[in-house]
Amino acid sequence: MLTSRPRGTEDILPEEVGRWYLLENTAREVSRLYGYREIRTPIFEHTELFNRGVGDTSDIVEKEMYTFIDRGDRSLTLRPEGTAPVVRAFVEHSLEARGLPVKLFYLGPMFRYGRPQAGRLRQFHQFGVEAFGSRDPALDAEVIALAMDFYTRLGLKDLELHLNSVGCPACRPAHREKLKAYLRPRLEELCPTCQGRFERNPLRIFDCKSPACQEIVREAPTVTASLCPDCAGHFHRVQEYLKALGIEFILDEHLVRGLDYYTKTAFEIMVKGIGAQSSIGGGGRYDGLVAALGGKQVPGIGFGLGLERVLLALEIQGQEPPPEGGVDVLVVTAGTGVDLAAFRLLAGLRAAGIRADKDYLERSLKGQMKYANRYPARMAVILGEEELARGRVSVRRLDAGSQEEVPLAAVVDYCRKMKESGW
């Protein structure tokens, strides 16, 4: 057990890290293009934050949270999602005082207890954005566009945007009563979880994955048919903005998302043809969440995207990001009197922004060259006693097999120019 990772977790090995760099760098790049700034919150929070913020009828709170009592007898929970912690930070630090809107993004690990499967781990990673301070439907469209932009920059294809409105506190009560009236005669046919949701939050039954429950709600009254004029107008404008951006979408009246805080716009992004884990992200508007967590009446909208699912989708589509490479230059030594000069050369290469390394296992010249190819390195700079005495080094291009002598004093500049020319 000491040498086995916990079930539902993964080690990201060095050769896999390059894929994560690509995802994280793309997320940061596209977020900044849209005017979002990074925020980092603790990986654990007070349990009450998620009970109140995520909702006690959600699957997350009911059965997926990693909760523990610390030595101060405080109930703490490893964060299962990113929105509630960001909202907590927004309230705690009075970020609205700095001027609205406030547009933030985050990257980091989340934790949910569930059955591990491909693309669905107990420790997983999310990229998310949260925008506070505006009810403008254009902001909804911007948030959706940012998510779609992220995916397309990675090369993902066959994306489907599912869109719905889940209403607001003004129009949901009427739909709630219609839905309960429809479900009441078939209450005993619902799964035990949905039977428990019937009184507390029947809208969540639309989100149930049970085939029996899905069949029952197939003809159920949807919240879209009960929208108040404000919600209906808002939803119409969101669609207009998406059309103006050329973003195609599917109206999905059964889409409610799995969290209780959503109001008005809800969306989910799926990839066709990748099996059960076709949903790779989603989000929506939460105009009451900031106030519910003790802040002012500040509206918000955001999304959370699972990065493991993105990697799975890229792999299935043959668009998998390239693995992390080795180094640009391996400094190879021949003889015992060149170690200090080689070490100085290594430092000079790194100072010039060139990824460089050397052999620390005292291999032979032949062994070092094999190591350079296996690393892999683009070039080997070979420094021997005879070359050092003449102030020269040999530079070998490992891909082409060509080799030339270069003055030792000029080799760093030589390598820098090679890098600038694309090697």
From Swiss-Prot:
Catalytic activity reported: tRNA(His) + L-histidine + ATP = L-histidyl-tRNA(His) + AMP + diphosphate + H(+)
Record EC number: 6.1.1.21
Signal peptide (UniProt feature, chain positions): none
Record InterPro entries: aa-tRNA-synth_II, aa-tRNA-synth_II/BPL/LPL, Anticodon-bd, Anticodon-bd_dom_sf, His-tRNA-ligase, HisRS-like_core, HisRS/HisZ, HisRS_anticodon
GO MF: ATP binding; catalytic activity, acting on a protein; histidine-tRNA ligase activity; transferase activity
One annotated Gene Ontology cellular component of this protein: cytoplasm
Keyword line: Aminoacyl-tRNA synthetase, ATP-binding, Cytoplasm, Ligase, Nucleotide-binding, Protein biosynthesis
Domain of life from the UniProt record: Bacteria
Subcellular location: Cytoplasm
Pfam families: HGTP_anticodon (PF03129), tRNA-synt_His (PF13393)
Disulfide feature: none
GO biological process, one term: histidyl-tRNA aminoacylation
Family, similarity comment: Belongs to the class-II aminoacyl-tRNA synthetase family.
UniProt cross-references to NCBIfam families, sorted A to Z: hisS
Subunit (UniProt): Homodimer.
HAMAP family found in the cross-reference section: His_tRNA_synth
Name of the featured protein: Histidine--tRNA ligase
Lineage per the UniProt record: Bacteria, Bacillati, Bacillota, Clostridia, Moorellales
Gene: hisS
